[in-house]
């Protein structure tokens, strides 16, 4: 059965590839048990301690060892030499299951040249063996046990309800709107009162400064009204003096010169 195969055949192997090169390359896939180089055939057999090492190594077919791209495939008919018993005992605890995607990422980080589809094959391998789904299932199981999602949702809803309750009890939103509206109306009224008093605008210099300050606070409406009043001044000097508002008396420029 292919699932029990621990050896792979490396074809198209460069004559310059050494045993060290081969071992370094395949050590990312798993613990290498033995390497059998067939120099006359430009190939080699690599045997791993675990079947997963061989399965992961096949995903690296098309990568380069030394200066040449190689072909890697399972070797079910190859009989590896028996490993020393002492070596097996000493290294048995070091075998770990690792994701193929991690293997590919590590090799790329080390500068190995891999096949263009190595990453895709590694992801498919992990999904097939349930590495990704197992991790996702673990998170879902934990979420189900402690109810994290429900707690976060409930917490958010509670905060929103509290905010609404405070707003309804104290009418924060409506009161804020009312304050802005009242302030806007007050400034507008003050601007209108000054602007209607044309005598003050024409006869007293400090009134112009006061008007500018009020008009600026009132906004564009006050500014447009001011321009309209100033435009009408030259054509109606007599009317402004004859029809004075109740409570006002004429002020002549001569009075200012005496002072």
Curated annotation (Swiss-Prot):
One of its GO terms (biological process) is negative regulation of plant-type hypersensitive response. Residues 219-259 are annotated as: Disordered. Keywords: Cytoplasm, Membrane, RNA-binding. Disruption phenotype: No visible phenotype. Residues 6-77 form the RRM domain. Residues 232-243 have a biased composition (Low complexity). The keyword Membrane applies. It comes from the Eukaryota. Its main location: cytoplasm. It holds the Pfam family RRM_1. One of its GO terms (cellular component) is plastid. InterPro entries: Nucleotide-bd_a/b_plait_sf (IPR012677), RBD_domain_sf (IPR035979), RRM_dom (IPR000504). SUPFAM superfamilies: RNA-binding domain, RBD. One of its GO terms (molecular function) is RNA binding. It is found in: Cytoplasm; Membrane. Interacts with ACD11, PR1F2 and PR1F3. This is Binding partner of ACD11 1. It comes from Arabidopsis thaliana.
């Amino acid at each position: 059965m292919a699932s029990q195969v621990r050896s792979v055949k490396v074809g198209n192997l460069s004559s310059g590839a050494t045993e060290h090169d081969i071992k370094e390359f395949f050590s990312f896939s798993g613990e290498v048990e033995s390497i059998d180089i067939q120099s006359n055939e430009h190939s080699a057999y690599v045997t791993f301690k675990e079947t997963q090492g061989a399965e992961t190594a096949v995903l690296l077919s098309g990568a380069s060892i030394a200066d040449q791209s190689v072909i890697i495939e399972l070797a079910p008919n190859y009989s590896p030499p028996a490993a020393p018993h002492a070596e097996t005992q000493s290294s048995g605890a070091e075998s770990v299951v690792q994701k193929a995607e991690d293997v590919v990422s590590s090799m790329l980080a080390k500068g190995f040249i891999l096949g263009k589809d190595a990453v895709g094959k590694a992801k498919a391998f992990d999904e097939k063996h349930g590495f990704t789904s197992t991790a996702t299932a673990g998170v879902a199981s934990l979420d189900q046990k402690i109810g994290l999602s429900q707690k976060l949702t409930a917490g958010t809803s509670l905060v929103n309800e509290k905010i609404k309750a405070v707003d309804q009890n104290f009418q924060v939103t409506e009161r804020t709107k009312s304050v802005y509206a009242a302030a806007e109306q007050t400034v507008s009224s003050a601007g209108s009162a000054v602007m209607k008093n044309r005598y003050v605008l024409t006869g007293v210099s400090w009134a112009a400064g006061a008007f500018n300050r009020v008009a600026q606070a009132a906004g564009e409406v006050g500014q447009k009204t001011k321009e309209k009043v100033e435009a009408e001044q030259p054509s109606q000097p007599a009317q402004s003096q004859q029809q004075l508002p109740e409570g006002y008396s004429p002020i002549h420029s001569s009075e200012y010169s005496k002072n």
